Amino acid sequence: VNEFTEQSLKIMKESPINKKRNDAKKKSLSCILLRDAGNKYPDVKPINEMYSMKFSCIVDMPVELGISEVLEMKAFEAGGLTDYEEKARVAAKAMETQNAIYVHLKGPDEFGHDGDAIGKMKNIEEIDQRFFKTLLANIDSNKVAIVISADHSTPCINKGHSDDPVPILVSGNFIKNDGTTRMTEKQAKKGSIGLIQGADVVTTSLDLIKSQIQPNL
């Protein structure tokens, strides 16, 4: 890794692309960031075997693409990072043949790293209006549940990740209301799911859904 980093720094320093960027008064490309590298392939069962279900995904980022390959999840193409309506339509269509589909939306995290609280708020509102509104219009909420959460928190004040708990919402017409009215950290504390570990999110959500969905659906 160190040798790769040293060579990449030298190559980028002499790159004609950086010369053009410098001439245009733009910042140079100075480093290739390597993170979360491993030295062996994870020994994990395919997710369909773990849960006896058909899982699939819509993901854009390299880490999530890697996870989907390791877990042998079918990946659906659904436009670019901000093609929220397309992602919602593809997800809804996929539910005709799949039992569950994981959709990873990157947007709010970027605003957190930039320390842009207003931008983060507006992006979450945009996702709500464009992705979830489209998704709800294309699924039967009497038969399909939606689980919303985050893989980590990115407080704008930190401009980085933190270990603060993130809210989780399990919603569907057949899911009993536990008194919460909004998806916020404060409301999540009052919810019936309680505080759980990230590794338990899928199992906890599936158990809740299976316990409340009508047997004939």
Show the residue positions of the predicted features.
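Feature captures the catalytic ectodomains and active-site-proximal regions of enzymes
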Residues: 1-217
